[in-house]
Amino acid sequence: ALADNEKTFYSIAPPPESWSAERKESYFREYNDFMLQNLTIHEAMPGHYLQLAHSNSFKSDTTVRALFGSGVFIEGWATYAEQIMAEHGYGAPQVPMQQLKMRLRLIINAMIDYRLHCEGLTEAEAMDLMTRSGFQEEGEAAGKWRRAVMSSCQLSTYYVGNLEMNRLRTLAQQ
């Protein structure tokens, strides 16, 4: 169903030239060197790239299964990869600290997803939760709010998937 051995890449776009100096500064506070290392672990190795390489080698009985992967599994694996790299000492001390911020983001994203779609969470409440409790820059939080409004349950996949990966790890260790 899918072509084998296709080339892949991962890139991080710089902030647009049209942004103000203040907005660019905020972007670089959020996407600092340590965040970019964590993001690379998540998006590339051993995160999405590794998982999808294995997934693409799986020969499914149906085209539907081959084309539509599990978002919970995909994001769960990538966030678990971040966690494992930090647990095993990858990078400077700031990398595990950044990973803890990302772990907090997983939890807050799931809360926002649920509360928005089930309890009527307002934009102001969500922004406060993300910026004050989650230490996210305002621009990042605003983008996350738009994402939450435009999709239901996607932001929760990271947290739910991570919980399941950790549950499986615990079972394997027993």
Predicted regions: what is each one?
Residues 1-174:
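Long, His/Glu/Asp-enriched segments that create or flank divalent metal/ion-associated functional microenvironments
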